Amino acid sequence: MPKLTPIRRKKFEKFLKFVGCTLKRTKGDHFIYDRPGLDRPVVITDDREVPVFIIRNNLRVLRISTDEFFQILREI
């Protein structure tokens, strides 16, 4: 399994859309995504890269393993 590293925000947004999330709103420099069946929204900031801790937290919210995450990234 590859190590999680920061990725570009645009790439992470493509990943979120691929797994069925839609942009609900923006507040300041935060983008809030949602998908039916989630307990809480997925939040990312308007930074150039998404840090590892935000990726890991959002994968936990989405109930997606890191292996599945890397497989999806290869597909998109």
Q: Which role does the model predict for each range below?
A:
Residues M1-D29, D34-I76:
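Basic nucleic-acid-binding interfaces
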